[in-house]
């Protein structure tokens, strides 16, 4: 009987290759450095706001416009509330953006090494994609993207800083992409920008084709709450609202709305924890280099590294045996790299110790 179940599926579903998230295992004393979670708890103000929101009002639907949160995001970034869209994590925001903007006659342009969910969204919505190779240093080849975009496309999507490489682009290069694609949307996914990248939010007023997507999962320690947002000119936000209200009018619950507003407003907590992560990242990069790893320059809360004499998949497996979890990707161009989330200083110390033990083995 199970073999017959796919007969009920829509044809596109059978062909889908869904995104595979990093595992969330239950291993005692695990050092978990595989999903780029923040090692520090969220703002106490956010926790208090969530607890207060849970105390009353849960029998009522939340605000379908999420106005208080959109206003908080707008205040933080010098925008207007009608330039902000919010959703149940940046993945949902990205999915709505793909549906709203990229179902065109021409292909959507993506770097060949980037967040793998982009290709899943495209496949889900029947969007044709063209993958443009990153350069030998695994940097997004802006010149190649500009040249290709000028011949026509459905738009561009890049992560900046890029994932899983951690390498960022300066704003001048983002502006080149925007200028090359004036009739289509350029989506800049800034999930990791708070750890050292240059945000394109300052360009929203200048470019009607720019959509910037961010998340509260990483730098605000709210991965368990699922809150993301997009910023762009009002006509882009209107399109996202139309998609949202055709799918789920209430994507953010009362607890998420309350916690997210408080987390955004607690600037001091954000800066303190963010600075700890950046400092730990720089120290870990040096320690990995001392162990013989090649470490790409990172502007994120992770590092991307390879060892010239050891297989990355084997290293990941040996670390897992020692209760240290990192992320390995099988994609050919990056199959010899490990993506290592920046944990606490103590967690990173355990990682380095375990790697030293593995590398010392004959």
What function would you assign to each model-found segment?
Residues 172, 317-322, 327, 331-362:
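PLP-dependent enzyme catalytic core of the Aspartate aminotransferase-like
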């Amino acid at each position: 009987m199970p073999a017959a179940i796919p007969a009920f599926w829509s044809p596109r579903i059978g062909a889908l290759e869904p995104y595979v998230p990093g595992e969330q295992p239950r291993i005692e004393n695990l050092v978990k450095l595989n999903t780029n979670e923040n090692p520090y708890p969220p703002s106490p103000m956010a926790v208090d706001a969530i607890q207060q929101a849970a105390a009353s009002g849960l029998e009522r639907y939340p605000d379908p416009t999420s106005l208080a949160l959109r206003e908080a995001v707008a205040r933080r970034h010098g925008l207007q509330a009608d330039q902000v869209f919010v959703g149940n994590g940046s993945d949902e925001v990205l999915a709505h953006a793909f549906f709203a903007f990229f179902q065109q006659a021409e292909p959507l342009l993506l770097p060949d090494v980037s967040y793998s969910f982009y290709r899943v969204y495209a496949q889900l919505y029947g969007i044709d994609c063209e993958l443009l190779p990153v350069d030998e240093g695994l940097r997004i080849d802006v010149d190649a993207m500009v040249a290709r975009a000028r011949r026509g496309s459905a738009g561009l999507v890049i992560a900046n800083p890029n994932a899983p490489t951690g390498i960022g682009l300066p704003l001048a290069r983002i502006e080149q992409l925007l200028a090359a694609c004036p009739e289509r949307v350029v989506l800049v996914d800034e999930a990791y920008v708070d750890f050292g990248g240059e945000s394109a939010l300052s360009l929203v007023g200048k470019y009607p084709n720019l959509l910037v997507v961010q998340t509260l999962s990483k730098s605000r320690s709210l991965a368990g709450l699922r809150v993301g947002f997009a910023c762009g000119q009002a006509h882009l936000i209107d399109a996202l609202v139309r998609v949202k209200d055709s799918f789920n009018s209430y994507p953010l619950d009362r607890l998420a709305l309350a916690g997210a507003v408080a987390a955004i407003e607690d600037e001091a907590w954000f800066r303190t924890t963010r600075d700890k992560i950046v400092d730990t990242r720089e120290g870990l990069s040096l320690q990995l280099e001392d162990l013989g790893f090649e470490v790409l320059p990172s502007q994120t809360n992770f590092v991307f590294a390879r060892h010239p004499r050891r297989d990355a998949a084997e290293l990941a497996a040996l670390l897992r045996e020692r209760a240290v979890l990192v992320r390995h990707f099988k994609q050919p161009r990056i199959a010899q790299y490990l993506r290592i989330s920046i944990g606490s200083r103590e967690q990173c110390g355990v990682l380095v110790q375990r790697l030293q033990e593995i590398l010392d083995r004959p």
